[in-house]
């Protein structure tokens, strides 16, 4: 369930930021970086979702403490949040974005390993992800879904 809901806080982020074809400015970055906390707040009232609140909140933390929203480092980041983070980054890399086309599986894996080497991702999680995805270079490169289809 956390995989489906981890970015629910983005419902308050303007589409102009989500679909911006270039780098975000400081204000836009701040707005974007609020989505984990907002997602946690959206899900908190639902008792059945309380076990996944730490995953929603911490899926953008980095092993070296440079992530957000709380600057957690290393094992202070829940393991399931570290796993979700790797899956989320892989998904982002292999999906078309307004600023670039989707990357193939092997290129995405190379980036994940580089981010682990830089101290941002859990290297053990990246290694396990690479192991379970080995031989699966048939993973489709996916296009993006128009956000408008998610708005009521």
Spell out what each predicted region is.
Residues 1-152:
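Metal-dependent catalytic cores of enzymes that make or break cyclic nucleotides
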């Amino acid at each position: 369930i956390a995989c489906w809901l981890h970015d629910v806080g983005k419902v308050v982020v303007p589409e102009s930021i989500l679909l911006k074809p270039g780098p975000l400015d400081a204000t836009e970055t701040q707005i974007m970086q609020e989505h984990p906390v907002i997602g946690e707040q959206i899900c908190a009232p639902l008792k059945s979702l309380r076990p996944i609140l730490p995953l929603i909140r911490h899926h953008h933390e980095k092993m070296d403490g440079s992530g957000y929203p709380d600057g957690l480092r290393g094992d202070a980041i829940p393991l399931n949040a570290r796993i979700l983070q790797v899956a989320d980054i892989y998904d982002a890399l292999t999906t078309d974005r307004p600023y670039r086309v989707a990357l193939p599986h092997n290129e995405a894996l190379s980036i994940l390993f580089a981010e682990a080497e830089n101290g941002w991702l859990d290297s053990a999680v990246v290694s396990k992800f690479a192991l379970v995805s080995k031989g699966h270079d048939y993973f489709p490169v996916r296009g993006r879904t128009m956000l408008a289809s998610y708005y009521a």
